[in-house]
Amino acid sequence: ISIHTAMDNSIVGVNKIICDKLKLNKTRILIPKKGTIKKLTTYVPEKNLEDLKNKLYTSGAGTIGNYDECSFSVKGIGTFKGNSKSNPIIGKKGSQTKIEEVKVTFTFPAHKEQQVLQTLKINHPYDEYAFEIISTENTNKDIGLGMIGELDNEMSENEFINYIKIKM
């Protein structure tokens, strides 16, 4: 029986410790995991864009691999008509409003979803705002099963077995 834990799937977990004991070079995750990166899209007035982006960056949005503060934005026209219970910051209740908005998209680690959503909720200027979160097919080079690396010198199978006995 082999019990696997989250530590088996981390770049700094059990497999990394084994690689370090064996003094392996050029180590990397053997089977990178999918579904650990999500994407947030929302729509915001251009005047509020930079503030919202910066707040979301501090919550973990906009990261992928070795990069942070990543986003994609495109301008468009948003329309809405608030009912009698609405509280629009732009436009009037009962009248259709057209406004230039920016569609902005961020990637983020799946485990930070609640933190990112809470930041969006607190900092989005609209009382009602549209957003979507989807899982991506990107693999995460730091999360996955197993690790692989290279030895300094080539060894026969018997030499390698003896090497493992000494190092472990």
Segments predicted by a language model, with ranges:
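Hydrophobic structural segments
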Residues: I1-M168
